[in-house]
């Protein structure tokens, strides 16, 4: 699991920013304060590792994330034409650190090229590796890259994006080994190709989160798969998703992706609360915490919901997860430092109490109540 992310001159982070990560980490704060940039840095590495089994070239446009040109990700006030992304991680047997410096590519504006890499405090520039080293030294560098736990762990990431789609009634059949995309596509193919237990687990989970659900898959056609659902459990009548509450189809990809996430993997989720009643948001967080504990699943969640935060607090209070395995990161901005984000770690104690309540953190209801009482 990742324990730290370090950014420098990447997007809004002009100076080096160390971002602690726990088994369950919630990124919280006003819009435009750097939360998405944190996720995007990790997802860029994931995208390059997933598609090329390497991070020597960082592809800024791909099937996971699209950030545009190199100049779009380099901090606007950068003193050098480079940015760096660092990671720290641990497994049962070892800890690992990785820091990569990237600069612009000569041949394309949509790729960042590795300039220097530091693995477990041992540095080697990419240019030296390719121009000045012997073949034996070059092989050692390649080996050290392939042995990096932090790099290999990138392959364990699953991502559900903020701009995900609600499930459609019909999907073209794509065959085996289909994955759910960041936008939530292919979920019907995954349900159809998996064991019947997965469909039942998804139905039970949806029912618990949304206070009732029935799911049925029509898997008999050769070229397509259909889904029907209802907002009542064990319903004899099911309907196209468009004719049931939108939240049902919208949340399905997240629920299924969580259920199929392998042991010890990583799930990155943006705005899980979207289109859900506050009570459903709380129960969704209970579901996510349960899955995290059962499978040692690392959750990195960006959210604007007090109910998501409180869901983690309640889980700690009920001793479903240790307080040491959770953290809340509050993102704010100091106008005196020209918009540089500030990241404050808020701790949850054993009783679910929070270590601090900074401005704009879970205080909107209090602000509104004060106006109502004037």
Go through each PLM region and give its residues:
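Pre-Walker A-like glycine/lysine-rich segment at the N-terminus of P-loop NTPase domains
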Residues: 1-50, 54-59
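Phosphate-coordinating catalytic segments in nucleotide- and nucleic-acid-processing enzymes
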Residues: 4-6, 48-252, 257, 262, ...
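Phosphate-binding P-loop
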Residues: 16-22, 258-263, 290-294
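C-terminal lobe/lid and adjacent interdomain/linker elements of RecA-like ASCE P-loop ATPase modules
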Residues: 77, 283-374
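Walker B catalytic acidic pair
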Residues: 270-271
């Amino acid at each position: 699991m990742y324990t730290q992310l370090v950014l420098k001159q990447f997007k809004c982070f002009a100076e080096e920013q160390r971002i602690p990560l726990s088994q369950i980490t919630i990124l919280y704060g006003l819009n435009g304060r750097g939360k998405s940039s944190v996720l995007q840095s990790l997802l860029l590495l994931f995208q390059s590792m997933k598609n090329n089994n390497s991070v020597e070239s960082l592809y800024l446009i791909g099937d996971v994330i699209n950030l545009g040109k190199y100049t779009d990700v380099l901090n606007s006030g950068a003193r050098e034409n480079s940015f760096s992304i660092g990671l720290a991680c641990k497994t049962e047997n070892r800890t690992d650190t990785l820091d990569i410096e990237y600069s612009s590519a000569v041949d394309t504006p949509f790729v960042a090229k590795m300039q220097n890499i530091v693995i477990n405090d041992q540095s080697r520039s990419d240019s030296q590796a390719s121009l000045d080293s012997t073949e034996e030294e070059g092989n050692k560098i390649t080996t050290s890259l392939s042995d990096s736990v932090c790099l290999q762990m990138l392959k364990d990431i699953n991502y559900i994006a903020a701009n995900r789609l609600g499930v459609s009634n019909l999907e073209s059949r794509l065959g085996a080994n289909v994955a759910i995309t960041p936008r939530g596509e292919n979920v019907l193919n995954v349900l159809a190709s998996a064991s019947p237990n997965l469909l039942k687990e998804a139905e039970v989970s949806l029912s618990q989160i949304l206070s009732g659900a029935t799911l049925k898959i029509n898997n008999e056609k050769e070229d397509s798969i259909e889904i029907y659902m209802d907002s009542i459990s064990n319903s004899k009548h099911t309907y196209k998703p468009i004719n049931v509450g939108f939240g049902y189809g919208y949340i399905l990809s997240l629920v299924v992706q969580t259920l199929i996430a392998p042991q010890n993997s990583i799930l990155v989720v943006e705005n899980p609360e979207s289109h859900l009643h506050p009570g459903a948001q709380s129960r969704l967080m209970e579901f996510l915490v349960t899955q995290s504990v059962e499978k040692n699943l690392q959750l990195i969640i960006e959210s604007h919901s007090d109910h998501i935060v409180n869901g983690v607090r309640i889980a700690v209070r009920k001793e479903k997860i240790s307080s040491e395995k959770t953290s809340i990161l509050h993102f704010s901005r100091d106008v005196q430092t020209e918009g540089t984000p500030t990241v404050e770690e808020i701790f949850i104690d054993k009783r679910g109490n929070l270590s601090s309540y900074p401005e704009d953190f879970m205080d909107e209801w209090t602000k509104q109540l004060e106006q109502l009482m004037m």
